[in-house]
Each structure stands twice: as structure tokens, then as C-alpha cells.
């Protein structure tokens, strides 16, 4: 199975790499084995909301940043294969709904 990087996965890798941590160090923070955390960083496995919260606390960053990346990945996942104009229109509708 090929790597399916996501914006959240890329951010999680960057946070760990910037701090020169090993994946086993971060895996223990969220209560998973290192191979599982590695798959999360590659975008091959989903991460649970409570695990995102633990990572935000561990890295001392705003949870909203991680939630926004998670949601952006979900939108991209659903929009894959759709014409760009349809996706833009759908996002516009959501923006209006959220105002």
C-alpha cells in the first residue's frame, strides 16, 4: 500500500522532527505502538479526537490547528474525483451556512 500523506500527517511529522523526537516517544503519549503511530504520520491510519487533544497538549499547540487540518483532510478525501468547480461550490455553500 502506497503512502497517502495528508495535511495532518505532514504536520504531525513536522512537529516531531522539529523536536528531534522518535516516533516511539510520541506514540507513548497517545497510547499506541510505534508502528501504529508511524502509520498515522503517513496518513495510512486515522487518529482519534482524544489522541489529537493529547498531541496538542504535548506539543503545546492550539488544538484548533490540528482539528482544522483533520477537517481539511476529510473534505479533500470526500472531494477526490469531483470536478473542481463542484468542490468550490460545495465549499462556498458550507461557508455561507457557517456565517
Per-segment meaning from a language model:
Residues 48-65:
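DNA major-groove recognition helix of helix-turn-helix/homeodomain DNA-binding modules
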Residues 67-99:
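Short, charged recognition helix plus adjacent turn
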Residues 11, 22, 48-51:
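Residues that mark the N-terminal boundary/hinge immediately upstream of a DNA-recognition element
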Residues 1-18:
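A short, Lys/Arg-rich alpha-helix, primarily the initiator
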Residues 20-39, 54:
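Short alpha-helical DNA-recognition segment
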Residues 42:
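Short, conserved catalytic or interaction motifs in soluble domains
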